[in-house]
């Protein structure tokens, strides 16, 4: 689901060799800070921002030949802090002062700045959370990533409205602290070692998690004992990638065992959007998924000016903001009519998030002169809703995520009736719907370990990494564990096999799409990411482990 390549906008593969400052950057506030190199030093000047000024400008990700680049090349790509002068200025700005920095129309206050461009260090999204009462320096006194909080509920510290202005924007540096245990044993050689724990190695952790998943429904006492041991071995989300990933799966199983659901406080949306944007800047996963999906859509929309997208995976709408901009660039000679129908499950989607996404997409569309009609419907109505046949002059596209496999049979029957122009499906690499719950957990643990390894390789700002894990990856793991453990009758087959069984045929990605994806990965500052082709899917992998894949489908001709 996704965010922008904010630094470069080219026109096709031929432009990859000339990523220059001539390409405009999407604005986020009335004034943007630009840096000029003079005499080996950097100097800042303020220049008026270009139109449009939508808060979704920074959500625009590369989707076609005219917008492909990498957000890793900029100063903010890895969450680095600004210069000392900027830091001092930022430290004095509270959330209450944000309203004075931007226009007040269309709710461009706190959330507007959160979605804004991150080229100005004083407005960098990672810094929004630096001094939040929810996080303290003492939480990060151990090496590794993650918040040292065994409860780990998103509502652990509810922030009262009276303290909102205390959330200061700054660029404080996170200090790495040496493990106290290492210091202690380094100077006291005769101190007896701690009691030996039960096989704390990778194999032991994985086996215990798999066993807990096997017996969590049939033998709760045994599952509780296994998780109690894991609580001692994995007391906090710090350490190596496997240990951090295992911690989150252990927490998800604990919540499942005790029937605990996470309650979001009113400020969780701010934290989640900030983590989402940081993840897009640090990792190519989101850009790859959005770019590849949108390129397939654009190729299928050729010759149409009335477009209808049925979306089962809306996220924050960044994919569609990018697509709208691409449509304007390609078809500026003819008026465009775009309709987006969102199907969302009330159990898995927050109404505040959906409303935020809906309003901002409308605002963005109005600024680039696209006629947009967007509506949100409950997924529960899918089986009873009557859908009119589409016109021959209208292109219908469907966006699906493999993560919604529990609803996939119902969704595909509905989609088959629509007979869309194209269907795009994204797969996060952690979904193995043909496996039983315990084996699915082991596969997902391996996939998330690879994701953490890829994030560690970037060597990004520690605080940004902690926010990504807590507000983006941990909720994803909890949802995955909860959804797969529910007693729903589901066919034991892959989602690809279900597509074929329901009467859909795969569509091969164009050579242009593959070349653009390769160029995207090559712009990533670390080595280890690579693109693979598997059947009709285009995959982004880390060290041969799939992180995300995108495939395109059509209704099979009868």
From Swiss-Prot:
Chain intervals for the UniProt region annotation (Leucine repeat II (LRII)): 356-388
Pfam families linked: GRAS
Location of the GRAS domain: 196-554
Gene expressing this chain: SCL6
GO terms, molecular function: DNA-binding transcription factor activity
Quaternary organization: Interacts with Meloidogyne incognita 16D10.
Region of interest (Leucine repeat I (LRI)), residue spans: 203-257
Localization: Nucleus
Lineage, opening ranks: Eukaryota, Viridiplantae, Streptophyta, Embryophyta, Tracheophyta
Keywords: Nucleus, Transcription, Transcription regulation
Protein name stated in the entry: Scarecrow-like protein 6
Tissue: Expressed in seedlings, roots, leaves, flowers and siliques.
Family: Belongs to the GRAS family.
Region feature Disordered, mapped onto this chain: 19-90
Gene Ontology CC: one annotated term: nucleus
